[in-house]
A protein has these predicted regions:
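An N-terminally biased module of ancient metal coordination in phosphate/nucleic-acid-related enzymes
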Residues: 1-98, 107, 172-174, 179-181, ...
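Domain-core and long-helix interface of multi-subunit machines
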Residues: 94, 110-228
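Short acidic/histidine-rich active-site segments
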Residues: 40, 166, 230-238
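A short helix->loop->beta-strand "cap" motif at the edges of active sites that frequently abuts
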Residues: 32, 84-86, 197-199, 230-231
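Residues at alpha-helix caps and immediate loop-helix transition turns in enzyme cores, especially N-
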Residues: 16-19, 100-103, 214-218
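A short acidic, amphipathic alpha-helical/loop segment
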Residues: 103-104, 224
Length: 238
């Protein structure tokens, strides 16, 4: 068995202080044989770094996308430095919305990626974690809008590897009770498209860190994925 983590964030993500080389060293210490860096890009709510703006590793915490030049340069350097101890893959987490698809496709074509996570973090440029997306809507309405957006994404965009933390929005709605039945039919349609396109889904272990009652995605989603013939699953600590 090969122990791997395919959802890893470093200091290049605005919500992490974890230096990239420290991630690698800790992964080796834990016995992992493969990791994939998947730092955040969220077009629509975050700008890119401009050429004259200075990014300082370990210091900058501006709400922006990955500093691509520095990120890919350090990733390549560490992959060579530690190649005898661990396999380091090049990826990103695309926090995608339907209206940002063209920007992400441009980014995808700019690099030779090993792995891309497709995530839904915002809808109509409204964040989940701030509560802006949910404001003025019932839980049912929020779930409906979330899975509708996800369905549009997976039926439109194909240059990704795995659909990340599929029921992420639950983290911001109800950690105790899983509302799988609200959107079972829509989830089924999403999974069918994922499978037909030879993509996968992720088991995201951050559910324990966020004290969610159950797995992410839920055991019901995982069972349905298996029943539909899904075979590709990655594990990520996020």
């Amino acid at each position: 068995m090969v122990y791997a983590d395919y959802h890893v964030h470093s200091d290049y993500s605005d919500d992490s202080w974890y230096l990239m080389e420290d991630v690698v060293k800790d992964a080796i210490q834990l016995g992992l044989k493969e990791i994939c860096f998947t730092d955040h890009v969220d077009y629509g709510v975050k700008p890119d770094w401009k050429p004259r703006e200075e990014f300082q590793v370990g210091k900058n915490k501006e709400v922006k996308n990955v500093h691509y030049d520095l990120y890919f340069a350090e990733l390549d350097k560490l992959a060579k430095k530690y190649e005898k101890e661990i396999n380091i893959k090049k990826g990103l987490e695309f926090g995608m919305q339907v209206h940002t698809i063209p920007k992400f496709e441009e980014l995808y074509q700019s690099q030779d990626f090993d792995f891309i996570l497709l995530s839904v973090h915002q809808i109509e440029d409204k964040e989940f974690w701030t509560g802006e997306f949910q404001k003025g809507h019932t839980h049912k309405e929020s779930y409906d809008r979330y899975y509708d957006e996800m369905y549009q994404l997976v039926t439109t965009y194909k240059n990704y590897s795995v659909l990340a933390h599929m029921d992420l929005v639950r983290r911001y709605l109800d950690k105790e009770v899983d509302r799988f039945e609200y959107n079972k039919d829509k989830i089924k349609e999403i999974l069918k498209v994922v499978i037909e396109n030879n993509k996968g889904i992720e088991v995201n272990t951050s559910s324990s860190r966020y004290e969610i009652n159950g797995l992410t995605p839920s055991i019901e989603i995982l069972k349905l994925y298996h029943e539909l013939g899904g075979k590709i699953i990655t594990i990520g600590s996020d």
